[in-house]
Amino acid sequence: MRPASNHSIRFCPRRFDPEKGDRPTTENPQQPPVTADEQIDRANATGRTPVVFIHGLWLLPSSWDRWAAVFEHAGYVALTPGWPDDPDTVEEANAHPDVFAHKTVGQVADHFSAIIEKLDKAPAVLGHSFGGLLAQIIAGRGLSAATVAIDSAPLRGVLPLPISALRAAAPVLGNPANHHRAVPLTYEQFRYAFANAVDEDEAQQLYKEFAVPASGTPLFQAATANFNPWTQAKANSNNPDRGPMLIVSGENDHTVPPAISNAIFKKQSRNPGITETVTVPDRGHALVVDHGWREVCGVSLNFIKRWVQ
């Protein structure tokens, strides 16, 4: 691992080269076993460096399947354990939405921390949306060898609140009763919040393939974080053991506009470790699953390869 510096670096992403040996591929992917314990046992048995993927609201662990295959191909061992009680499939999730209700940021952060503490090697941690917030919490606990937070949900101390973010969160925050519910998105809501940067056909495909209900609780926790000193939606950005961190932002993201990602970057930049940021042009909140996922995956992999072998 390279020594941490006392300053932050801002850089532009290089295009992901499909001709390089670490190119994304879904041919013969080595998909992780289903249960968290099986994934932990496999990771420890391989002796390779683990990479833990954390999804956000309205998605399942399967949203990381292609990423997991890429990281396995690059020599890491991928874990996609999911949030507590996550169903195995989108169909099951939509048939039984109540399993998502009442999940809190603290509960899910502790769930992933417990998984990581069972690993023989400190992992790299990648998270998208609320998974990005969880990744920062885990890094703040000193449990991550390197962290990538992609379109991360805001945490305490992040002040910008763009109108598009309010509109994207309105299906949940617009009804206080949703605090204790599992809330699905209609196609129109998903189109605005996730799939605004893709065409209509792809938006329909993404909604059908990936969209599931989500716990309303984390959104209310994030929305009130700056008014609640005891909020669970906060990360220890000052911990010197936080490790290198990359903040990735989609230029056209409605749910987490660049103003939020930039504020997260500034907050994390106070850490003595390396903190870097990338804004991916012309991309929305679905950037980890849409047609351009390879570029974002490549940027993330290249960052992790610099720090974790």
Task: Show which residues each predicted segment covers.
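Active-site glycine-rich loops that stabilize anionic/oxyanionic intermediates
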Residues: 56-59, 251
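Conserved alpha/beta-hydrolase
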Residues: 72-94
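Conserved hydrolase catalytic core segment
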Residues: 124-158
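Flexible "cap/lid" loop of the alpha/beta hydrolase fold
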Residues: 144-179, 220-227
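Alpha/beta-hydrolase
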Residues: 180-246
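Short beta-strand/loop motif that positions the catalytic acidic residue
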Residues: 247-249, 253
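Conserved alpha/beta-hydrolase "acid-adjacent" motif
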Residues: 254-263
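Catalytic active-site module of serine/aspartate enzymes centered on a nucleophile-bearing elbow/loop
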Residues: 274-309
